[in-house]
Swiss-Prot record:
Expressed by the venom duct. Residues 1-33 are annotated as: Disordered. Residues 14-26 have a biased composition (Acidic residues). One of its GO terms (molecular function) is ion channel regulator activity. This is Conotoxin Am6.4. It comes from the Eukaryota. It is found in: Secreted. GO terms for cellular component: extracellular region. Disulfide bonds join C40-C50, C45-C59, C49-C64. Probable toxin that inhibits ion channels. Is not hydroxylated.
Length: 65
């Protein structure tokens, strides 16, 4: 005896990506509001917000309201 209960059948291991596949945040768009692409002086800013620094619009990833 091999000690396996499903001998001869395909054994399915735990899906390590199951949490990612069923992430409840994916169903709630309000969670992603701070991670939208904004126009920052003609340059897309994907991870934050646009701030004027030294007279120029620059993409910032911190200090975003």
């Amino acid at each position: 005896s091999t000690g396996k209960r499903n001998a001869g059948k395909l054994t399915v291991t735990d899906d390590v990506e199951a949490d990612r596949d069923t992430d409840p945040d994916d169903k709630d768009p309000s969670v992603h509001n701070s991670w939208r692409t904004v126009d920052c002086g003609g340059v897309p800013c994907e991870f934050g917000c646009c701030r004027i620094i030294d007279g120029k619009e620059k993409c910032r990833e911190i200090d975003c309201d």
